[in-house]
Every structure is written in C-alpha cells, then in structure tokens.
C-alpha cells in the first residue's frame, strides 16, 4: 500500500499497523515534548486510502483474499447498455467520461455458495477482512466474528470492490459516519464527484453513498468505486427510475433486478432498499405536516398506489436476498416513511414501517445476508431514544444507521448543527452509523466545502458518542488535546484537531506571527488574563506547598496558618502573578 504524501498537517504521517501479513492504515501524530518530558506519538483511525491517479484507481487490496477462499467465479456479466447512464447518454451515444482504467470480469459465488462475511462468521471462520477490522478497531478477531455472526455488526465488502479497506459497522465498535455525494439533473460532473469522494475520505468519512440522479449514473459510479477505499452505498431505485423515463408507475421488478445486478457487478457494497413501504402504511402519512420526504419512499408509495398492490421490493425480497448473497452486498433497509419534521416524529407510519423492516431483517439473515437498518430523520431530543430501543427490539440489534436526526426545524443553513446534536444523542444510545448532513441540507447540492463541513461535524458527533459510551481509547484523544492546550503546545493542538486548517486559520487571524505558536496565551484573554497560564504560575510557585496542603493529617488550623504564611510571602515578593 502506498502512503499518501499530502497529509492534513505536517505532524501527521502514514504509520500502518503491520501484523499477520496485513497492513492496516493509521495516522501517527508527532507531539512535542512537555516540560516534564517527551510525549509518545498519538495514533488515530485513517480512512483516506492510498494516493493514486484517479484515472487508474486504487490497488486491489482484497483480490488475493477473495480468490483464495475458492468460492467465487469470474463470469461475463450483463451487457452494458447506454440507458445505464441515463437518457442524456442515449442522446449522445456515450457517457461523458468513460472509465478507461482496469476493469476485470465480475465475480460471484459458485453455485450453492454464499460469500458473505456473515456466512463465514456463522461457519466459525475468521476471514482476512475480520482480522483487518480487529487490528483497525484494536479488538480481538473472535469478537469481530461473533458480532458479525449475530447480525449485530456488518463488514460491507462486495467481492467486486476489492479496493476497499475492510471496516465494521456495529454499536460495539467505533461510531461510523457516512458522506453522501452524487450528481443531480441540475449540477455536477464525474470529475467533481470523484473529487468529493477523495475529499470526504480525507477528512474521515467511513463510507460514501453515491446518490446520483443525473447524467452518467453508471459511469460516475464506476469511477467512484474504483477510487474508493471505503464501502460505497447506493439507492438503486434512483437509477431504475431513470431507465423508465422518470415515471414511477412504469417501474417493474425486471428493471429493478437488472439494475441491482448491474450495481452488484460494479462493486456496490450496500444498497438502500425501501421494502418496508407497504400499501397499508401510505394512508398513515396523509395527516402528516410534511408527508413522505424520502425520495425512495415516495417513489415506491407512488408505485403502490398506481398499481394498488404491494411493492415489487417487498414481493421479491427473497430473490433480492439470493442476489446479495452471491456478491456480499449488504442491505441498508431504507426508512421510506421517516419523519421530515418534528411534528411527524415517532408517528404510526414511521413505526409501522420499522416493525416491517425488523421482519425483513430476519428474512435476510436466513440467507446469511448482512443488514443494517436506516432511521430518522427529524426527531425532538426527548423522543430520540425510543427509536434506538424499538430498532434494537424489532430488528434484533441489527446496526442502526440514521440521518441525524435533526432536533429542530428552524435553522436552514445550519442543519449540520441541528442534526449533529441529534446524531451525538442517538449514537450514544446505540446507533452504529450516522449519515452526515451538510449546511446545504434542504437548500441545494453540497460542494466540496460543504462535504468537508458535514464530515468534520459528524466526526465530532460520532467521537462525542464514543466518549460517552466509554469506548476504549476514545477519551485518550481528548486527553492528549487537553494536555497540549494546558502546556501551550499550539502546533500539537492544531495537529490533534479534527480540522487543523480551520484551527490554524482562526488562531492566526489575530496572532499570525510565528512566535505566537509558542506563546503562553491566545487572543481570547491575552497574556495577563490567561487562566491556564495563571494556573501554571501558581503550580510553579506553590506546587509543593499545595501538595502538602492536600495531604491527609493536616488539620484545618494548620492549613489556615499555612495559607496565611504563603500570603505574606507573596505580598513580600511584590504581589505579582507573573515574574520576569
């Protein structure tokens, strides 16, 4: 694996864990010495992958592991069609920027085999992917296998996405975040979406969903998968809808099935499937303030009403399971009836669908297919935990994956904040992965800067939840920052930040000179009113005496007299907190 040279801070370096023939990426942060002695480098989780030419794609890390198991076969695959890239490609006669890099024949399971991580885990096998994850999470491989076997965690790793570095989603592990990218009919290009992918993983996205609905859907996805070190998710109904000219009523199982196989062959690791939207649940949304806000949910609701029958996703769910088991694609069972406003939170429609999703989870597990369950949405703080509790009850502890939730509806332009508040709360209560929200939510398609803001905000929420849950090692990062802050190691503070660039920029707005990076104050309080500097001076001047005052056996009168004596010494010495 080639380390990236373009680190986000000069104190960062690529420092992988090398064990059992694996190379598991981590970032090492070099720290300056403290007054009391040297500090060990600090190590953090790394998602960004190797730095390569996007036209070539990433190294195929997992190919030897996949083929060594002897349960997959190469095959020709479906025929590529122009409609795969949408109506504009049909008019042009080609995609706007064809993928010209390496594209081996697709793999799928041999007849009678299931090549999912859940199938291996249930058979008692610790795969290379599980070993990789265990090193990454600093846990025992058997613990990883056990959680995957029980369905409480998933390792989304399509056999046709060997470039991905294995990661795990489950509430017993680090809280993960997802970043959504993808074009629309209005804006963006393939190059821009690949750039967003690289930008999102640079700042810490654990998975990325390609939600493209515009031109070149197939080709955009090919570029993204070939350049992604993290699992890629999609909502295949979007592409299927494009294939029938955007008319939901014209969708069919045959069109959808073909689209799913197309995406399985490309290497999509998990797919959002809105199979829980049942005909009987749609009337429950009529009294809502904001109706059905999920794009996939509204598409399927429209189809159900047009045909007055259950959706083909529900009716053909078992066949979907059979397909997913051949490629190790995980279900992300979509919450098509999620609330789009506080007024609609935790209503009958939302929870009716969640209960059905729980039943579908059990059916998928019968095929050894990995599952996570999607959740809301817009939910007041006091109503959030009920979502965790019901999901764990009805979906038997399958990983919960939520969009926020937003805890207030009054802040367009700041919904990354309104949702991060809810995200931290729901993750603390057991949600395994958080889907980021950017400042553009409800307003427009996010650009690179919005992607970064969304990722950083959600890394913060996820980490706060890990600290609250007592996840091993989570607090160590905060403690390293606090120590650097108290010792005025400014460059270490920047290096330990989630976003060093912004931390440096804010500091340098008022104190840009290089000597300010070693000063024992900042512009907030200045040199005379810095509480930490005053605390340090007090420690330096009275450290031993303070320690003595805290020792057992010192009576109250002795303590009082000792304080008076030190007060006299301080006044006699000039009465200055700061001495030259």
UniProtKB/Swiss-Prot annotation:
Instruction: State how the cofactor is bound.
Output: Binds 1 [4Fe-4S] cluster per subunit. The cluster is coordinated with 3 cysteines and an exchangeable S-adenosyl-L-methionine.
Question: Which residues participate in [4Fe-4S] cluster binding?
Answer: 522, 525, 530
- Membrane-spanning segments: none
What's any one GO cellular component for it? cytosol
Reactions this protein catalyses: 5-amino-1-(5-phospho-beta-D-ribosyl)imidazole + S-adenosyl-L-methionine = 4-amino-2-methyl-5-(phosphooxymethyl)pyrimidine + CO + 5'-deoxyadenosine + formate + L-methionine + 3 H(+)
Keyword entries, A-Z? 4Fe-4S, Iron, Iron-sulfur, Lyase, Metal-binding, S-adenosyl-L-methionine, Thiamine biosynthesis, Zinc
- Pfam families assigned: ThiC-associated, ThiC_Rad_SAM
- E.C. designation(s): 4.1.99.17
Gene3D superfamilies documented for this protein: 6.10.250.620, Radical SAM ThiC family, central domain (3.20.20.540)
Give the pathway listed in the UniProt entry for this protein: Cofactor biosynthesis; thiamine diphosphate biosynthesis
- GO terms for biological process, alphabetical: thiamine biosynthetic process; thiamine diphosphate biosynthetic process
Q: Which family does it belong to?
A: Belongs to the ThiC family.
Query: Which HAMAP family does UniProt cross-reference here?
Result: ThiC
> What is known about what this protein does?
Catalyzes the synthesis of the hydroxymethylpyrimidine phosphate (HMP-P) moiety of thiamine from aminoimidazole ribotide (AIR) in a radical S-adenosyl-L-methionine (SAM)-dependent reaction.
Q: What is this protein called?
A: Phosphomethylpyrimidine synthase
User: From which organism does this entry originate?
Assistant: Corynebacterium efficiens (strain DSM 44549 / YS-314 / AJ 12310 / JCM 11189 / NBRC 100395)
Q: Which gene encodes it?
A: thiC
């Amino acid at each position: 694996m080639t380390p990236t040279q373009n680190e986000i801070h000069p104190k960062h370096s690529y420092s992988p864990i090398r064990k059992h023939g694996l190379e598991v990426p981590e970032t090492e942060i070099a720290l300056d010495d403290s007054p009391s002695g040297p500090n060990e480098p600090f190590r953090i989780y790394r998602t960004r992958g190797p730095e390569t030419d996007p036209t070539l794609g990433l190294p195929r890390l997992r190919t030897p592991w996949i083929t060594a198991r002897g349960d997959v076969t190469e095959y020709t695959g479906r025929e590529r069609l122009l409609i795969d890239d949408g109506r504009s490609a049909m008019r042009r006669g080609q995609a706007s920027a064809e993928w010209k890099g390496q594209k081996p024949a697709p793999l799928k399971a041999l007849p009678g085999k299931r090549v999912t991580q859940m199938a291996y885990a249930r058979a008692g096998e610790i795969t290379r992917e599980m070993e990789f994850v265990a090193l990454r999470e600093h846990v025992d491989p058997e613990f990883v296998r056990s959680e995957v076997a029980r369905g409480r965690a998933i390792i989304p790793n399509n056999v046709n996405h060997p470039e991905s570095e294995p990661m795990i989603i489950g509430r017993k592990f680090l809280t993960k975040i997802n970043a959504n990218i993808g074009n629309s009919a209005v804006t963006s290009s393939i190059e821009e979406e690949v750039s967003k992918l690289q930008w999102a993983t640079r700042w810490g996205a654990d998975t990325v969903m390609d939600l493209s609905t515009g031109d070149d859907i197939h080709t955009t996805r090919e570029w993204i998968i070939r350049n992604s070190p993290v699992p890629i998710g999609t909502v295949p109904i979007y592409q299927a809808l494009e294939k029938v000219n955007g008319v939901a009523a014209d969708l069919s199982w045959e069109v959808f099935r073909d689209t799913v196989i197309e995406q399985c062959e490309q290497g999509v690791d998990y797919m959002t499937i809105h199979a829980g939207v049942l005909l009987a649940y749609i009337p429950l949304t009529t009294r809502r303030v904001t109706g059905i806000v999920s794009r996939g949910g509204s598409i399927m609701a429209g189809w159900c009403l047009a045909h007055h029958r259950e959706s083909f996703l529900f009716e053909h769910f078992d066949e979907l399971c059979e397909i997913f088991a051949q490629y190790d694609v995980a279900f992300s069972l979509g919450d098509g009836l999620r609330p789009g406003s506080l007024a609609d939170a935790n209503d009958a429609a939302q929870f009716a669908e969640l209960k059905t999703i729980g039943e579908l989870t059990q059916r998928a597990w019968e095929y050894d297919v990995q599952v996570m369950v999607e959740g809301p949405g817009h939910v007041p703080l006091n109503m959030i935990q009920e979502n965790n509790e019901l999901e764990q009850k009805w979906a038997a502890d399958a990983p919960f994956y939520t969009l926020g939730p937003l805890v207030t509806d009054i802040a367009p332009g700041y919904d990354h904040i309104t949702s991060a508040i809810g995200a931290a709360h729901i993750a603390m209560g057991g949600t395994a992965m958080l889907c980021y929200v950017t400042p553009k939510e409800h307003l427009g398609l996010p650009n690179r800067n919005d992607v970064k803001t969304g990722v950083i905000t959600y890394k913060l929420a996820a980490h706060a939840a890990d600290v609250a849950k007592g996840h091993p090692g989570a607090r160590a990062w905060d403690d390293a920052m606090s120590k650097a802050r108290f010792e005025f190691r400014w460059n270490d503070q920047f290096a330990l930040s989630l976003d060093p660039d912004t931390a440096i920029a804010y500091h340098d707005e008022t104190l840009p000179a290089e000597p300010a990076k070693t000063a024992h104050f900042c512009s907030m309080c200045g040199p005379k009113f810095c509480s930490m500097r005053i605390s340090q001076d007090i420690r330096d001047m009275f450290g031993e005496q303070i320690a003595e005052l805290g020792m057992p056996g010192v009576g109250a009168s002795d303590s009082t007299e000792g304080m008076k004596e030190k007060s006299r010494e301080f006044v006699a010495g000039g009465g200055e907190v700061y001495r030259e």
